[in-house]
């Protein structure tokens, strides 16, 4: 009897396999696509004012190697997140149109109609003078060491009107002076 039950089980399994194998089932396939972006860490940048008015400057007061109507502006770097690359340094880069006059970079937009003058920007916690090192387009300000994520930080700047040296100051004409500087978070 034991042999018969073994044979009966085998026959049932073979029959069931043939039955299931012989049935045609319509199948439908769907595809699941994946995507992801790998990004470096970043920070939020904000200025304490969006427009920095340098007021009216008397043409007669705009002399060689002077910096007039200085005004402070603060750049805040915060909400930093994500991991920094082990070989790169987080920085803020200053970019803007202008030109070098008497060895000093003066920011100035192409729509300015004033002659010979521009805006000198200095990164300093205290009021600078014309002799201070100015910010040039492309200068960068480190926020942390290489491979480190920055912590909240404030960078103090001062901006003032200048005409550079004797030659450029001789070409000063009255008009509207506009300048812009973009501060960009980057890894270097």
What are these regions (language model features)?
Residues 13-22:
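Bacterial N-terminal signal peptides
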